[in-house]
């Protein structure tokens, strides 16, 4: 009788648990628990996005840590979504996203019918599948407190990424054989590590835009602080340094334009903190200069001058830190380092020029598709002929070629809605400037995605989803 009694106990236990869950669901406590768990996993998800690039450092078949976290967050958000499904479907951020998804399905059908590249078509679909994060975040980030917590995780991830970039830079310069480290980072899509010369290394993590987002979050938080917060100053200086080591023109441009938009927004929303904001910016730039100078002395690389050289495509004199180092060592403080070092840098700049030529060919090829069907596009899978792997890089031209003007406008409409909402509800943004920080942070992705396809992949779409949750988070607090 013992097995029978044991089975009865198990059955009774399961029945009681099911009844408890049903009662909790009826009262809303079960939904609340799931929402809390979903939010916690989303924090880990965005932390991971802001550090590890492609997120392929650990995989079990097709499943990576990022896919696992995103899937769990979505499943746990389902009770909240189903409980108030009608209300969420009326949210402009949700139904505008669904309208774009419907158009995307139409473009996929057109791509199949036109016999476009099937591998590229599937890649397009996989990238935009992350749009499921929009309803998940809208349903989960339902208060200002949760929005602030989420941004704290993103800021922490951005600072960790910056520290890793500086560590990788120093390790590659100092190691006798840095090839295994570079190969591991490249193969696991964390980022690109190119050895420019014996003293210069280009370290570009695919999560780099999140470092600009981190700068924006720190700026807005400092604006509301009663005094200068040195932890934010040092964090921004570290982020600036890591962005410098990327030697990536699109990131430099995005940093400049995002800084302009963010500073204007801060001065408008937080007028009482203008002096502290200006002092914060000055202190961050000074700390950044000190940090770069120390690195140039220690690692003997002329980072600033090479960054300018790669940006403008012309050789410039070495930075003052490198010249001062030469003087202190009794060396010839000329405007150039040794010939071998400069030859390596010139060769890398020539590679950049060849890359620009390939980019121009890509644009010309995509323009052929755009001219063929500018309104509705040529369907998913349409790809530049000169790109064997189908990776075209130019997001806006990709969208116009594959989904047309209609598709691009539908994709950007939710962002337009949030911008209009922010302009109309400025009083809520003054109470919670972090909402404006999220929107300014998304400007970074809209800028850098001109050169790299961030906005049709998880890193850009994840932040897009955070942005679309801002009205819900700020209005819910006011309800």
Where are the language model's segments positioned?
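Hydrophobic transmembrane alpha-helices and their immediate junctions
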Residues: 403-446
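Alpha-helical transmembrane segments of multi-pass inner-membrane proteins
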Residues: 148-182, 198-270, 417
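Long extracytoplasmic/lumenal interhelical loops at the membrane interface
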Residues: 336-405
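A membrane-periplasm/extracellular boundary helix in multi-pass inner-membrane enzymes
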Residues: 266-350, 368-372
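Aromatic-anchored transmembrane helix interface
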Residues: 94-102, 116-140, 149-158, 162
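Transmembrane alpha-helices of multi-pass inner-membrane enzymes
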Residues: 259-260, 437-479
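Juxtamembrane membrane-water interface segments that cap and precede transmembrane helices
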Residues: 50-57, 183-201, 379-398
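Transmembrane signal-anchor hairpin modules in multi-pass inner-membrane enzymes, especially those
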Residues: 1-108, 112, 145, 152, ...
């Amino acid at each position: 009788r013992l097995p029978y009694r044991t089975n009865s106990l198990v059955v009774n236990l399961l029945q009681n648990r099911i009844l408890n869950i049903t009662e909790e669901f009826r009262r809303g406590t079960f939904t609340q628990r799931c929402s809390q768990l979903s939010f916690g996993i989303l924090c880990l998800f965005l932390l991971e996005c802001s550090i590890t690039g492609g997120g392929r450092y650990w995989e079990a078949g097709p499943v990576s840590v990022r896919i696992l976290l995103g899937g769990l967050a979505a499943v746990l958000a389902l009770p909240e979504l189903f409980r108030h499904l009608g209300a969420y479907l009326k949210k402009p951020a949700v139904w505008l996203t669904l309208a774009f998804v419907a158009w995307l399905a139409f473009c996929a059908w057109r791509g199949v019918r036109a016999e476009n590249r099937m591998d590229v078509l599937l890649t397009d679909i996989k990238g935009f599948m992350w749009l499921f994060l929009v309803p998940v975040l809208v349903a989960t980030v339902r208060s200002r407190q949760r929005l602030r917590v989420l941004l704290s995780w993103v800021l922490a991830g951005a600072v960790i990424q910056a520290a890793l970039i500086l560590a990788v830079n120093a390790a590659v310069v100092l190691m006798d054989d840095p090839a295994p480290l570079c190969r591991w980072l490249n193969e696991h899509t964390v980022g690109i590590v190119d050895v420019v010369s014996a003293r210069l290394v280009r370290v570009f993590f695919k999560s780099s835009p999140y470092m600009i987002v981190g700068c924006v979050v720190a700026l807005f938080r400092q604006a509301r602080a009663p005094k200068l917060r040195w932890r934010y100053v040092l964090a921004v200086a570290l982020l600036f340094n890591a962005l410098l080591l990327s030697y990536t023109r699109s990131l430099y441009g995005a940093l400049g334009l995002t800084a302009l938009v963010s500073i204007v927004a801060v001065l408008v929303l937080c007028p009482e903190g203008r002096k502290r904001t200006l002092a914060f910016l000055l202190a961050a730039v000074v700390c950044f200069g000190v940090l770069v100078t120390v690195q140039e002395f220690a690692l003997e690389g002329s980072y600033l001058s090479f960054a300018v050289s790669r940006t403008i495509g012309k050789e410039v004199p070495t930075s003052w830190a490198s010249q001062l180092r030469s003087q202190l060592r009794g060396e010839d403080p000329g405007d150039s380092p040794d010939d071998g070092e400069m030859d390596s840098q010139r060769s890398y700049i020539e590679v950049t020029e060849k890359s620009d030529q390939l980019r121009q060919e890509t644009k010309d090829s995509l323009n052929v598709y755009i001219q063929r069907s500018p309104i509705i596009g040529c369907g998913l899978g349409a790809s530049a002929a000169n790109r064997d792997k189908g990776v075209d890089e130019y997001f806006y031209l990709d969208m116009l070629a594959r989904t047309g003007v209609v598709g691009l406008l539908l994709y950007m409409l939710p962002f337009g809605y949030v911008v209009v909402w922010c302009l109309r509800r400025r009083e809520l943004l003054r109470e919670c400037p972090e909402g404006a920080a999220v929107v300014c942070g998304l400007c970074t992705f809209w800028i850098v995605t001109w050169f790299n396809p961030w906005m049709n992949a998880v890193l850009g779409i994840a932040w897009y989803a955070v942005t679309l949750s801002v009205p819900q988070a700020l209005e819910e607090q006011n309800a």
